[in-house]
């Protein structure tokens, strides 16, 4: 069953069909993160995520939206500051994880994205931000979110990763962070395709372009294989289907990982199909008993229609009781019910943001 809908992102661009043919052999690995301080780092052991000392790590984090859309729209890389003071504000909320959305075209430097915001410049900005998060004791999750097949531009999140470019992105992302054992990588955010197609790839429900043409997708098994061949040995996060809201097929359709370092991800919002404790007990709990599970996106309502805390408190309290991590949507100053903050000094925005801040403080 599909979720009730998707969030309305702050800035979705219009689709542009380019005549330029694209040829990408892979992105440069310049600026790769050093692993000298993270020789072991985060690793999966059974259904727990552990740090280098063997202590359990449970994410209580936020999403930092902007890196998926600012670059493709041609006005920046981040939406808001990426400074030390802005990260310290996150740390003051006791955030220990930040999910960073990745734009495929911007990372690879393809499809006529402005050079100032793409390719080496984009990758360097992401790497520097990851280092800044590390210095503040925060674990980054890097998640491919906006992508597009062929010469289409990656102006929104489509139904599945594309066979044309996503494998090159996975290879480059994995190579860039292969020495950093304090990150987790997610090859995709939200999918609309069925569980078989999401695992194996192929032409299925995913479409793109003004005529909604089907395209060849790349599957999660290919993602894991590509990342491991690129020498990334850390955790890989695999989302569920139906906009990551349905994990009922996750255990039967998880990729094979020779390193046994897979985590599961669900996206849970108020008004989603799966947004009740009974659904969590039925579909999330069995997964959480087998592998580490995070709510990679979660909020009061998927459409930003409610600024309260009745839903998010239910979600996070259930997660706390089941050892499940979470990353709230979103650490941005959008001035609506999706926003956690009213400024990048960390002032909470509305009851939603205030509840999250208080809850994270209580977890200490």
Residue ranges and their predicted role:
Residues 12-25:
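Bacterial N-terminal signal peptides
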Residues 31-97, 354-362:
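N-terminal carbohydrate-binding accessory modules
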């Amino acid at each position: 069953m599909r979720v009730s809908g998707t969030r309305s992102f702050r800035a979705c661009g219009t689709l542009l069909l380019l005549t330029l043919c694209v040829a990408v052999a892979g992105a440069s690995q310049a600026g790769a993160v050093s692993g000298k301080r993270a020789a072991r780092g985060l690793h999966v052991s059974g259904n727990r995520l552990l740090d280098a000392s063997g202590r359990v790590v449970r994410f209580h984090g936020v999403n930092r939206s902007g890196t998926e859309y600012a670059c493709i729209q041609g006005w920046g890389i981040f939406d808001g500051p990426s400074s030390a003071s802005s990260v310290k504000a996150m740390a003051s909320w006791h955030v220990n994880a930040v999910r960073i959305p990745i734009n495929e075209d911007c990372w690879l430097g393809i499809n006529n994205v402005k050079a100032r915001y793409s390719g080496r410049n984009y990758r360097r900005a992401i790497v520097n931000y990851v280092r800044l998060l590390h210095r503040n004791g925060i674990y980054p999750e890097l998640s491919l979110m906006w992508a597009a097949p062929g010469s289409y531009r990656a102006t929104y999140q489509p139904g599945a990763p594309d066979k044309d470019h996503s494998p090159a992105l996975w290879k480059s992302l994995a190579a860039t962070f292969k020495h950093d054992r304090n990150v987790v990588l997610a090859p995709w955010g939200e999918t609309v395709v069925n569980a078989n197609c999401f695992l194996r790839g192929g032409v299925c429900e995913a479409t793109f372009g003004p005529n909604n043409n089907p395209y060849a997708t790349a599957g999660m098994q290919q993602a894991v294989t590509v990342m491991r061949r690129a020498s990334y040995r850390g955790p890989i996060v695999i989302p569920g289907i139906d906009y990551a809201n349905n994990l009922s097929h996750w255990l039967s359709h998880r990729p094979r990982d020779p390193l046994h370092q897979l985590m599961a991800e669900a996206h849970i919002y108020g008004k989603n199909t799966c947004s009740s404790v009974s659904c969590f007990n039925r579909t999330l709990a069995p997964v959480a008993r087998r592998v580490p599970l995070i709510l990679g996106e979660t909020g009061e309502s998927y459409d930003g229609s409610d600024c309260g805390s009745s839903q998010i408190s239910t979600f996070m309290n259930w997660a706390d009781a089941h050892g499940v991590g979470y990353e709230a949507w979103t650490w941005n100053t959008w001035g609506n019910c999706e926003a956690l903050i009213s400024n990048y000094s960390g002032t909470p925005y509305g009851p939603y943001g205030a509840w999250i801040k208080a809850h994270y403080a209580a977890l200490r």
